[in-house]
Structure formats: structure tokens, C-alpha cells
């Protein structure tokens, strides 16, 4: 649930990834799908592209990895599960342990 909350917060808040980039690595995530989503977010960030539901979806689709994470429906679930990104750093530190 924490992994989902952090990924969802990153999807909904443009400052989400910068808040956790020094805390989390791809292998901080237990779920392979979450690792792939986070890796995609990092790639977008490194290219100075926005990180949101649409850009992550398009990137995963282009790399033919969308099905590996559960498709667009799973990305939408992630973004819908988070009411706020206020505690993203705290949650990221728990995941990183």
C-alpha cells in the first residue's frame, strides 16, 4: 500500500519525484510492476519531461511494457488511491528501509 501511495503521489504532484529521488531507488520497491513504473518516472525526469498519468502511460506503451504493470487501469488506480502527496517523503523513507 505504501508503494502505491508513493507512486500515486508522484503521478499527481509535479514535485513528487524530486521529493523522493534521493531516498528511493528502483530496487527499493518490492513489486516488479512498481519498479518498472518508478524506473519509467526516473527516465522521464532525466529527460526533463513531465511526470503524470499520460506521460508514464505513453512511455510504457512505447517501450511495450504497459501490460507488465497491469495496463492503464492500474496506473489510474494508483493516481486515484492518493488524496494528498503531503507525506510522500515519510512514506518513501519507510519503503527505503
Question: What is each model feature region?
Answer:
Residues 1-97:
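Noncatalytic partner-interaction/assembly domains of nucleic-acid and motor enzyme complexes
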Amino acid at each position: 500500500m505504501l508503494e502505491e501511495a508513493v507512486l500515486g503521489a508522484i503521478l499527481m504532484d509535479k514535485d513528487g519525484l524530486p521529493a523522493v529521488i534521493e531516498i528511493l531507488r528502483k530496487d527499493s520497491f518490492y513489486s516488479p510492476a512498481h519498479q518498472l513504473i518508478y524506473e519509467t518516472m526516473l527516465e522521464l525526469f532525466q529527460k526533463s519531461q513531465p511526470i503524470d498519468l499520460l506521460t508514464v502511460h505513453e512511455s510504457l506503451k512505447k517501450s511495450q511494457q504497459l501490460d507488465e504493470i497491469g495496463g492503464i487501469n492500474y496506473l489510474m488506480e494508483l493516481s486515484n488511491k492518493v488524496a494528498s502527496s503531503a507525506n510522500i517523503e515519510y512514506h518513501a523513507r519507510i519503503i527505503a528501509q
